[in-house]
From Swiss-Prot:
Keyword set includes Transport: yes
Protein's gene: mmlH
Similarity annotation: Belongs to the major facilitator superfamily. Sugar transporter (TC 2.A.1.1) family.
Alphabetical list of InterPro entries matching this protein: MFS, MFS_dom, MFS_trans_sf, Sugar_transporter_CS
Organism classification: Bacteria, Pseudomonadati, Pseudomonadota, Betaproteobacteria, Burkholderiales
PANTHER family tied to this protein: CARBOXYLIC ACID TRANSPORTER PROTEIN HOMOLOG
Cytoplasmic side: 1-26, 72-80, 132-145, 189-227, 274-287, 336-356, 399-428
Protein name (Swiss-Prot/TrEMBL): Probable 4-methylmuconolactone transporter
Function: Probable uptake of 4-methylmuconolactone.
Keywords for the protein's UniProt record, in alphabetical order: Cell inner membrane, Cell membrane, Membrane, Transmembrane, Transmembrane helix, Transport
PROSITE patterns found in the cross-reference section: MFS, SUGAR_TRANSPORT_1, SUGAR_TRANSPORT_2
Ranges annotated as spanning the membrane: 27-47, 51-71, 81-101, 111-131, 146-166, 168-188, 228-248, 253-273, 288-308, 315-335, 357-371, 378-398
Localization in the cell: Cell inner membrane
Spans within the Periplasmic topological domain: 48-50, 102-110, 167, 249-252, 309-314, 372-377
Amino acid sequence: MFAWYKAGSPQQKKTFWACYSGWALDSFDMQMFSFLLPALTLTWGLTKAEVGVLGTVALVVTAIGGWGAGILSDRYGRARILVLAIIWFTLFGVLAGFAQSYQQLLIARTLQGLGFGGEWAVGAALMAEVIDSRHRGKAIGFVQSGFALGWALAVVVATLLLAWLPKEMAWRVAFWSGIIPALIVLFIRRHVKDSSMFERARQSRAPRASLSSVFNRKYARTLALSSVLVIGLQAGCYAILVWLPSLLNQRQVAAGSMIVTVFIMAFGSFCGFAVTADLSDRIGRRPTLILLSVCAWIVTVSYMLLPLNTTLTAILGFLVGFSAIGMFAALGPFLSELFPTNVRTTCMGFAYNVGKSIGAGSVVGVGVLSTHIGLANAMGTFCLVAYAFAVFGIMLLPETRGIAIENIGEADAHSPAAPLAQPASARS
């Protein structure tokens, strides 16, 4: 499982740690906010509607950030824009800690979301272009496991600060703490370079990325199906993760057990990232994503039907993290292998972040449907529809395991059903 890392060049290892740390920091800043909402609500007397806007605005604007960062990355380089994205969301996260009103915090969170959208696609493309095609799934998948680390750190930091400091100060310090891990920017600027593949593409006569690139009919079918895939995966994930605490509360699971469950879910997601990363290189991107989509829905149904106790809650929490979150380890390699180098991050950023923004609508959908059929049934229904949506997109996209992404041309981009040549090592 780790042979790819041991065999990697110093530059590949530095790139891995830069992308891993950037994604962990992104997760830390994003997940921290969810743990601070109760303190903010108490301090400023926010309504549920205001809390809802604060909680979703960053997710919505990630679509713009991902699209914009993708275009800039395809034009000016992956490493440079990765640094910019990290600086951006760190800066506005720190400024959020100085907010004196709801309106100021809303503006800071909105601007911070632009940076969140930019980091994922740029980091995934950078990693895809420097790693050997035989190990691309494992490498990018392990980068994705940085999400679990950032999530766990957010739980620890938020819990300690809220326990040690007055609530009106704790949330501010929590936002300010995001600047410490951002020192990774100094490492990236000094040690991480763009791949030779990207440099060759930039010097070629291939058309440069622009705002209109994603509307080019050459990429339209692949981009549309990629977006459908991401919408399904994100909708299912949000339907489970956002509403799970409420479901556990309905089942009268103790608050202490719920905190433990969050840690177990984070650990489960880390294990899921590792296994998914390896599995996608062994059996392919499509079978891996389909298998885990089915598993995630089964776990959700189990929450609906089984009588929950402490042990079962912990087991199912691990399985939720493993399947619903861990499956994203196969998404980065898959999307990076679908588009040519000259528009790779533009299309990846659009598909991932637009899909994420639309998929987040499942949070509202579950809430509305739950008033008619109950929360557990609403979660199960939405997850079934979401993962069926994802599988539909997967089935119409090609298997890409092991392809040489430097050879992806414009013909490949608009003919996803066409067979893609794979090296013998990838097929074995």
